[in-house]
Regions:
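An alpha-helical, amphipathic repeat domain used for nucleic-acid recognition
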Residues: 1-171
Length: 171
């Protein structure tokens, strides 16, 4: 019914720059993401480099700031752990040193143990019946995928379920 037409190729620096600004108004982008987005809109690699340099020079594109905002959002809103956040930032092309700095800053204001405990309690409320090994393993896997350290997960599961949680290193 609806066909998604290909966006037309942009030929001038101003058109490409305006497209970049529209994308940045919708959400923040890493340098890598923006470069990919602009490259899809033009065949001129030089034009992409010029627009990228202009965005960086004007302070509209900064991976360090992006990593800080992304990390803060993921820890506060989505309650995700540092491993998941780092993986997602790497997928967005952010450098490891910027990722580590952002995670360290967020760690100063985030209580990982409390976040793990809250997620376990929420999962336990959702589980019907008695907590068996399968349900505990499911919660454990869910928290690992959310990016929390396995030792913190095991400790909190043990505290909240008063059962022995198997020792596995699946970080």
């Amino acid at each position: 019914m609806f066909s998604r037409a290909r966006p037309r190729k942009l030929d001038t620096e101003d058109e490409l720059y305006d497209e970049a600004l529209r994308a940045l108004m919708r959400r923040a982008h890493s340098v890598h993401e923006m470069k990919q987005k602009l490259a899809r809109r033009t065949d001129n690699e030089l034009l992409v480099r010029v627009v990228m340099a202009r965005l960086k020079e004007n302070g509209q594109l900064d991976d360090e700031r992006y990593a800080q905002q992304f990390t803060r959002n993921r820890t506060q809103s989505r309650k995700q752990g540092k491993f998941r956040i780092a993986r997602d930032l790497r997928a967005r092309g952010v450098a490891d040193n910027q990722i580590n700095a952002a995670i360290e800053d967020a760690a100063a204001t985030t209580d990982t143990v409390a976040m793990v405990r809250q997620r376990i309690e929420r999962k336990m409320r959702a589980c019907r019946g008695e907590m068996d090994e399968r349900k505990i393993a499911s919660i454990y896997g869910s928290l690992l995928r959310a990016g929390f350290p396995s030792d913190v997960i095991r400790k909190e599961l043990k505290n909240l379920t008063r059962e022995e949680v198997p020792e596995t290193d699946a970080e």
